Amino acid sequence: MDVENLIITTLKDKVEELTGNEMDIRLDEPPAINMGDYSTNISFRLAKDLKKAPKVIAEDIANSLNISGIEKIEAVNGYINFFMNYSDFSKETVSKIIDEKENFGKLEKRHEKVILEHTSANPNGPFHIGHGRNMVIGDSLKRILVASGYDVETQYYVNDMGRQEAIVVFGNEKFELDKSKKADHAIGEVYVETNKLLAENEELEQEILNLMKNYEEACEAGIENELTEKFKNAVDYSLGGFKETLSTLNIYHDKFVWESEFVKSGMVREVIKRLMDTGKVVEDEVFRLDLSDYGLEKKLVLARLNGTSLYSTRDIAYHINKMENCDFAVNLLGADHKLTAVMVNKTLALLGYNEAEVVFYEFISLPEGSMSTRRGRFISMDELFEEAKSRAAEEVRKRGVAESEEEIEEIAKKIAVGAVRYNIVRIAPEKPMVFRWDEALDFEKVGCPVIQYAHARCSRILENVEIISNDNLFAYEMNENEKTIVKLLSKLPKIVEKAAEVRKPQIVANYVLDVAQGFNKFYANCPVLKEENQIIKNSRIAIVNNTKMVLENTLDLLGIEMPGKM
C-alpha cells in the first residue's frame, strides 16, 4: 500500500468535489513524527475559491476523509496532518523488504537504452581527484539508473588523437619509461618531462604537429604502421593503469571507445561534409560552424584548412554514434566544458539528432591547494586512496576489531573506498568541494564509516539471533524511534526513482546517512536482544534485519561495500 499516493488521490478527489476543478497536490513531511507523517496546505490554496478561512476548510476536509492506512487526520491552523497506522504499515514494509531482499529499491524495467559516458580522462598521466569526482558521480549514477529500470551502457571516450597523446608518443622516444611504476604514473612522468623539453625548445612543437597529422592521415587511410603502433601501445599502457585505479574503486566501464575509430570509419569526414552542406560553415584561418541561430556568438572550430580534423569534430561524430545506439545519452563533464558541450549539442540539433544530457560538476580540491597535471603538481587518485586506506587501517587497529594484518587490510580497503566515494558523491556536483579527511573518515556524523558502522551493529545483533520470527509483528504501540526507522526504510524505491529522474546521486547518499542515523537512534533507545516482551523483541529484530538489507542495497548503488566489522 502506497499511503502517500493514496492520500494525494483522495485529496484530489475531494478538491474536485468541492470546486469542480483539478489541483496538483504535493505532500510535505512535518519536522517531527508526533506532528504527523504527511501534511498539506491545500486549505490555503482553496480559500479564495471557497470564500472560507483556511482553518475552517482544513477542519471540514479533515472531518470528511477516511483513508485506508491512516488512523488519524488533524486540522491544525489551516494545515491538514495525516498520521499513519504504524502497526499495519510496519508489517507491510518489513514483509516487502524480506520478500524482495537485494531487489528492494529496484524498479520495473523501462526498456530504454542509456549510454552514460564518464571519466574519459586523457591517457597522459594518472587520474587526479578532479577525474575522481567524475568517475564516482558517473558510476553512482549508472548504478542508480540501472536500479530504476534502464538498460545502461557506460562508455569511456579515449582521446588518442590529441596533442597530449602526441606529446606522450614523442616523449617515449626521448625518455625511458620507468617500468617499476604503475603504468599511468610512468606515462605521466614522461609527459611532464616532455613538456619541459618543449618549453625549452619551441622548434620541437612542429614535430608534435607532424605526429598528430601523420597519425590522423594513417587512421583515415586505414593504414597500420610503426606510428599507429606507437600511439596504440602508449594509450594501451596508460589505460592499463587507469583500469587498476577504477577497479580499486569498484568502477567498471562496459566499453572503451577510441577517438580514432571515427576517423578510421570515415564518420568524421562525413560529419564535416554534412556540416559544410548546411551553409553554416565559414572560412577564417580554419573552418568554423556558425551557431548563431541557436543563440551562440562563438563559432565552433570544425577543421583546419589543410583538412585535418579537430577534437570537436571527432566529438560530434562520437555523439552521433551514441545517439544512433541509445534512447538518450548522459555525459559527465567538468563545469569548464559548459560552452563546448552546448556547442556540440547544438551541432547535433542542426544535424537532426537529440541532444545529450550533461551532468556538470565543479572543481574539487584538497585543503593543500589545487592541481596541475602539466607541471606534475597534483594529487593522484591512487595517492588519495592509499592515504585513506592508511588512515582507515590506523583506526581499525585502534578499535581492535581485526584478528590479523590481512583482516586489517581487508577492512581498511572497504572503509577507504567508502570514505573516498561517499565523501565525493554526497556533495551536489554543481557545488565546488574541498575533500577533507576529517569528514571522509568521520565515524560519528557525516562520513561513510557512520553508515558502515550502523551495518556492522546490525550484523552483530543478528549473529545472536537463532530464528527471525515474523509472527504478530508490531502488535503494540510503537515508539517514535521505531516509527522513524521503519518509515525511512520504506522510502528506498522512491529515493531511487527520484535520484534517477533528476540525475542526482547525492539524493541516495543523503538518504542512506539518514537511515544510518535513524538506526543509531533506534539502537540507543530501543533494546533488542534484552527486550523481555517477545512480540516487541521480534519486531525490533525484524527492524534490524531490514535495516541491514536496506543499508546494503543503498550503498551498493554508490559502489560501496560493507566491512562487516568496524
From Swiss-Prot:
Coiled-coil positions: none
Cystines in this chain: none
EC number assigned by the record: 6.1.1.19
Record's signal peptide: none
InterPro entries for the chain: aa-tRNA-synth_I_CS, Arg-tRNA-ligase, Arg-tRNA-synth_N, Arg-tRNA-synth_N_sf, ArgRS_core, DALR_anticod-bd, Rossmann-like_a/b/a_fold, tRNAsynth_Ia_anticodon-bd
Glycoprotein found in the keyword field: no
One GO location term (cellular component): cytoplasm
PANTHER family: ARGININE--TRNA LIGASE, CYTOPLASMIC, ARGINYL-TRNA SYNTHETASE
Protein family per UniProt: Belongs to the class-I aminoacyl-tRNA synthetase family.
NCBIfam families the UniProt entry points to: argS (TIGR00456)
Protein name as annotated: Arginine--tRNA ligase
Species assigned in the record: Methanococcus maripaludis (strain C7 / ATCC BAA-1331)
Phylogenetic lineage: Archaea, Methanobacteriati, Methanobacteriota, Methanomada group, Methanococci
